[in-house]
Amino acid sequence: MVVIFDSVDAIGKDTQIEKLVQEAHKRGIITHILHYSNIKGLKDNNAVRDLSVKQYQSIFTFMKDVAIPSKDLFIYNRAHLSEYVYSPMYRNYDGYYVFALEKTILKDSLSKDIYLFSFIDNPEKIIERDKERGDGQSFSLDLDKKKQELDMFK
């Protein structure tokens, strides 16, 4: 089974994942957590996009060949929705390609055990939590950008 948690930073994905893992362990289910993030260290957005395409090809192939057929629980902390949302906003390229990859690679698997949770909350509360967390991981603490991010995750 595959469960994907995706949304903006500081919305509670990690908290929900921890709760799911605890429940799975109570039931004797083996869990694997895969955490994906943007590619760091490259200045050229075209190079980032090229590497991202390869990364998502690999993610979807692994999902199809290993995660979906397994009896284990594979939890993705971020996946392709983040690429779709953040690419045009912060990396200046269209992230819609992830849906074409998803459709091509997972075409026979999309009706299987794949569940997606995308969390939405009040943007002011998210920014407040993000500031309290203070890890500097969010792309932006700007209210208008946060609203745009949330709209794209819907």
Language model regions located:
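Anionic group-transfer/hydrolysis microenvironments
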Residues: 8, 78-80, 120
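Conserved substrate/cofactor phosphate-moiety recognition/catalytic segment
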Residues: 11, 15-72
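Conserved P-loop NTPase "ATPase switch" module shared by AAA+ and STAND
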Residues: 71-84
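Conserved protein kinase catalytic core
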Residues: 12-13, 83, 126
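Walker A (P-loop) ATP-phosphate-binding motif of ABC ATPase nucleotide-binding domains
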Residues: 2
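Hydrophobic anchor at the beta1->P-loop junction of P-loop NTPases
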Residues: 5
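A glycine- and Lys/Arg-enriched "phosphate-lid" helix/loop adjacent to the NTP-binding pocket
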Residues: 86, 90-153
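Loop/turn-to-beta-strand initiation segments
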Residues: 70-74, 112-115
